[in-house]
Every structure is written in C-alpha cells, then in structure tokens.
Amino acid sequence: MAVAGGRGCVRSLREGVLWRSSPCHCDYTATRHFLGALQKLPLQAWVRKVHTAPLRTLFLLRPVPILLAAGGGYAGYRQYEKYRERQLEKLGLEIPPKLASHWEVSLYKSVPTRLLSRACGRLNQVELPSWLRRPVYSLYIWTFGVNMTEAAVEDLQHYRNLSEFFRRKLKPQARPVCGLHSVISPSDGKILTFGQVKNSEVEQVKGVTYSLESFLGPRACTEDLPFPPASSCDSFRNQLVTREGNELYHCVIYLAPGDYHCFHSPTDWTVSHRRHFPGSLMSVNPGMARWIKELFCHNERVVLTGDWKHGFFSLTAVGATNVGSIRIHFDQDLHTNSPSYSKGSYNDLSFVTHANKEGIPMRKGEPLGEFNLGSTIVLIFEAPKDFNFRLKAGQKILFGEALGSL
C-alpha cells in the first residue's frame, strides 16, 4: 500500500515537472505574469507593453476580449463627444464638424465592409421557414419603425426571405406623386442638405463638403455623354451648366433601414449615360457624413446622367455597409460590389445607340431602381435661378412629395 502510494506521488511529481517544463505551461505562466503586470500599469504603459509583448503571448490573450476592449473604449469616446456636442447645442453654440483624421478613415476603410455586405446579401437570399418569418420580420419592423400598412402585401408570411421583405412594394395610393412641382423626392428618407452648388464643392451635411468632380468623375470626351465641351479654364461646375442664366443645384436624401427601399424618377428626363464607381461600403448615416469628408466619393455609387427640360440632370445611388447591391431596372449589365476592383476605377455605359439616339426616357414617379437596404440618393441638376426648394434640412420626406419648383 505504501509502495503504491509512493509510486503515485512519484508519478504526480514527474507529471508536474513535465507540465512545468512544457511549452503550454511556459505560455500559461508568461501570460499570467503578463496580465498581472498589466493590472499594475497605467494605460500608456499598458499599450506599450502590448506592443512589445511576444506574438505567442498576445495570441493567447484571445482577440475577442482585445477587440471588445478597444471597440468599447472607442465607442465610449464617441459617446462622450456626442454628449459634449449636445451640451454645446443647449447653450446655443454652433458646433463645427470634427472631421476624421487620415488614419481614422484608413482604419475604417480597412474593415472588410464589401465582404461583409456580400455575406449579408447571401444571407438575405436564404429562404426562411414559414414559422420563422413572422418573428424575424416583426423584430425588424419594431426595431426600425416600418409601416406595414403601406405595403401592397401586409401578410408577413408572403415574403420568403429578407431580400423580398426589404424590396416590398407599396400600395398605389400610399405615395401619390405631386404633379404640380417640377422635381419630386425619388424616395422616402431624410433630407441631409440641399441648395446651390458653388465653387465645384457640394455639401454632404452642413459644414462638410466633397468635390463635384471626384463624385461624378472626370468629364469624358465622347459625344454621347451629357457634358458639354468646355475650355480648360472653366471650372467643373461651369462645364455642367449648359444654359445661360442657369444655376447648379443639389439635394441629398438619406434612406434609413426602415424606409421604402425603391427609388423612382424625380422628374421627366432622359438618361443617356451610366457611370459605376466601385469603392468602399462605409456607413452613410448622418453621423458618418458629418465625420468623414468626401464620404460619398469613397463609397461605391452608380451615377445616372442625362437631360431634362432645363438642362443637365443626374441621380446618384450611393452604396453603404450591407447595401452593396444597387439595381437599376433598365441596366442589366450593372453588377455592384464585385469581389475585386481597381481603386479609383469606374465603368461607363452609354444608353445612346444608333437605334436609340436619345437615351432612356423616364417619366416622373416611374420606378428607377432599388437598394437592398437603406442608403443615399444624391440629385445634382441644372435649373433656372428662380428654382426654389420647398424643404428644411433634417426633415422626413416621402417618395412623390415636392422637392422644389420654379
């Protein structure tokens, strides 16, 4: 009995020695000492310690807690900034926009939003079992305030997947098209900004601008594009204004996830050209538009250009996170959010052919395209100087309601 007990002790001692000398025990001990040391260090020293720690030790810390800590700290910082802004607003002080630095934009763009958006697109196409449809759609309706009484089909069981639910049609009487005004809202959404375009800079929100040429792309020299020839000394804005006495106007409409996701023709016009810019898929909510300069120029977008009765007219659908899919009903060659693309590239397609020398005629209110989720519509158009917007920044608007008129 004593001999057996002695052998057990020897075996335990030997196993303990082997464990202590094993790589796992060394890593465990190193990690434990590393974490213990971190608890006694101030924040700056902790960051320095993390940067100088062995790779194997950092791997054993597990990435999830590190990401949660980093993300939580950054979210807390952003919440503090928002709190400070609210306090300044209460005092009646105008808050200048605090733009993201170059490294913050680069860090955000490093997030694989295109891959995540493609994954979400695939997930949205998965057919849901009948028993799961009502709870899933009801949760979405409750979260984003969707008004299903406007839907052509109110029965949630009718929608086989999330994609069909996002692209649901409305009852004809739900969105009457205003016939008295020359330009109507192409979609449901929130008005971010509007007004005249000056010095080839366009406001994405108040105080934050983007380059008109970067957004629409360089003026092409082909005859079928709706850009008139201009001398090199003219600004890009002046190249778009085709008639004497006219001005260039813009309007930005943000579509939230709970909004109706289709967009329509805002006026009677002819679409002669499409330009597709592959790009990032960063969020385009008003907070991000206030934070990142030229956000719309970074993101994937589809620019439709043409003419209306007063000259140049364009509608741009801007993609966003989980909104990599932009569909134009009459453009079957358009494929957005492709796995690979060249930075700064764009694809042109002319709708002017020998058989159709004018382009695609669109009537006011006619269906034009759709998103898979909320995003942004940007209108840039030429009109006489007495064109007046009937809007307020920040107001909610529905498809068919008036944007402005002469």
Curated annotation (Swiss-Prot):
Post-translational note: Is synthesized initially as an inactive proenzyme. Formation of the active enzyme involves a self-maturation process in which the active site pyruvoyl group is generated from an internal serine residue via an autocatalytic post-translational modification. Two non-identical subunits are generated from the proenzyme in this reaction, and the pyruvate is formed at the N-terminus of the alpha chain, which is derived from the carboxyl end of the proenzyme.
Keyword terms, alphabetized: Cytoplasm, Decarboxylase, Lipid biosynthesis, Lipid droplet, Lipid metabolism, Lyase, Membrane, Mitochondrion, Mitochondrion inner membrane, Phospholipid biosynthesis, Phospholipid metabolism, Pyruvate, Transit peptide, Transmembrane, Transmembrane helix, Zymogen
Assembly and binders: Heterodimer of a large membrane-associated beta subunit and a small pyruvoyl-containing alpha subunit.
Protein name according to UniProt: Phosphatidylserine decarboxylase proenzyme, mitochondrial
Mitochondrial matrix-side positions: 50-60
Segments traversing the membrane: 61-79
Reactions it catalyzes: a 1,2-diacyl-sn-glycero-3-phospho-L-serine + H(+) = a 1,2-diacyl-sn-glycero-3-phosphoethanolamine + CO2
Sites marked Cleavage (non-hydrolytic): 374-375
Location of the transit peptide in the chain: 1-49
Principal localisation: mitochondrion
Subcellular localization, as worded in the UniProt entry: Mitochondrion inner membrane; Lipid droplet
Record PTM Pyruvic acid (Ser), positions in chain: 375
Active site: 188, 264, 375
Pathway(s) annotated for this protein in UniProt: Phospholipid metabolism; phosphatidylethanolamine biosynthesis
Recorded family membership: Belongs to the phosphatidylserine decarboxylase family. PSD-B subfamily. Eukaryotic type I sub-subfamily.
Segments in the Mitochondrial intermembrane topological domain: 80-406
EC number: 4.1.1.65
Cofactor(s) this protein cannot do without: pyruvate
Cellular component terms per the entry's GO annotation: lipid droplet; mitochondrial inner membrane; mitochondrion
Physiological role: Catalyzes the formation of phosphatidylethanolamine (PtdEtn) from phosphatidylserine (PtdSer). Plays a central role in phospholipid metabolism and in the interorganelle trafficking of phosphatidylserine. May be involved in lipid droplet biogenesis at the endoplasmic reticulum membrane.
